[in-house]
Amino acid sequence: MKFLPLISGLALCLLLAACTGSKPPPTTAPESKQVSEEQKQGTTPETTERQEQNFQSLIQIISQLNGIPIEFLENGFRDRQHLSQVKKLIAPPPVTFQKNWQVYRSRFVEPVRIKASLAFIEQNRTALEAAEDITGVPYQVIAAIIGVETIYGRQMGNFRVKDVLSTLAFDYPEVPNKVAREILFRDQLKDLIILCWQEAKRKQEVFNRCLNQSSSYAGAVGLPQFMPGSILQFAKDGDGDGIIDLRNSRRDAIFSVANFLKVHGWQPGMPIYFPTINTQQTYPKLVELADGQPVLKYTVEELIQFGILEPNLGDLLKGGVEPLSKALIVDLPSPSKNQEPEVEYVVGLQNFLSIVNYNRSYFYAQSVAEFAEALGYKNQSAIQMNADISKNSSDSTQSKKKVNKQKKNKKVSKPAN
C-alpha cells in the first residue's frame, strides 16, 4: 500500500492551538443558572463553535498536505453528527467499579461463540492455514480474535466511523489525559480520511461510503475491528484483489490479524501463558509482582525459583520455554461475597503481550488465549508437540518392526499328509 504524507499529532495540535483559546473570565460573579446536561458534558454553544472551527482547520490542513480536494472533504462530512452517547461509552468507569474476570470471560468463551468459530474455521480453513504458514500465528488464535471482536462480522458496531472520530477528536470526555486522547483521535480521523481517499480513487460516492461505514464507539471497523491507523500500517490484501476490505473480505481480515500479531512480536511455536502455583506461600509474591504494567520484567527461571511456576515450564522439551524467556504476572480479579476480590493469576509470555498490543486489556488477551484453546490450540511449545509426534512415530515404527520380526521368526507348520 502506498502511503501519503502524514502530519503528526503534535503538528496538528500546534496548528490548531490558535482556535482553542477561551474568553477571559468575567470580572463579576455570573448569575446562578441551572446546569444543563450539555453543560455537564462540556458541550455549550461556545465550545461547539470552537470544535467546529477546529474541525474545519483540520480538514483544510489534511487537504493541503495530502492533495485531497477540500470539496471532497466538505461533501463527505457535511452530515456528520456529534455523538454524546460515544462520550459516555468511552469514558472511564467510576472509581467504585469492580472488574470481573469471570463475567468478562463468560461473554466470549461460551457455546454460541465457539460454535460460530468452528463454522468459521471450517469455511475458511485454507486461508487460516495459509496465514499461519506465513506468519507463524496459529489459526485458532486468528479465529479467536475475530470471534471475540465481532462474532465473524455479526457485530461490527452501530455508529458511523466519521461521527465517532470527529466527536472524540474535538470533544473527548473530561479526563486527566483529555488533550493526549484528542490528539490520538485527530490522528485516527486523519488516517480515516487518507484511507478513504486511497480507496475512493476520486469517486465521491465511494469516499462517502468509506466514511460512513459502521464502527465501534472507539472508531474500530471491519471484522477484526482495526482502527484506521492500524489498517494503514498492518492490514493485508489476503485475497489478492488489490483492495484491502476488512468489512467484506474474510481473507483480508484473517491475514491482517495474523500480520498484526507477527509485527508485534509473535513467537511461532511458543505458548501464550502459563498457569501459576497460587498457595499461601506464593500468594504474597504474586501480588507483589502483578503491577499491571504490560512489560516482560521477569525470567521464567526467576518465577520457578519463586515457586510461582512448575519447574517443567522452564524446559522446552516438556512443553515449556527457555528458562531465560521473559514474562510478566497477570492478575485477573473477580468480586467475591466478602467484598474482597478473588484474583486468578497467570504468567503472560511474549505471545500474550502481542495480543495485549491488539487490545490493551489483560482480560481481553486471556479470553483470546482460552477461546483459542477451546478451538483446539495447544498452549505449549511446538518442540514438545513435535517431540510427541516423533515419539509416536518412532513407537509405531518399532511396533511394526517387532510384528515383522515375529512373523519372520514364526515357524511354518508342515502340511498334513
Over which residues does each language-model region extend?
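Cell-wall glycan-active module
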Residues: M1, A17-V179, Q188, L195-C210, ...
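Bacterial N-terminal signal peptides
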Residues: I7-A17
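Short glycine-rich loop/turn motifs that provide flexible caps or phosphate-binding loops at active sites
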Residues: S8, I146, Y152, A218-V221
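DNA breakage-rejoining catalytic core of tyrosine-based enzymes
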Residues: L184
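Amphipathic alpha-helical interface segments
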Residues: S216-G222, M227-S230
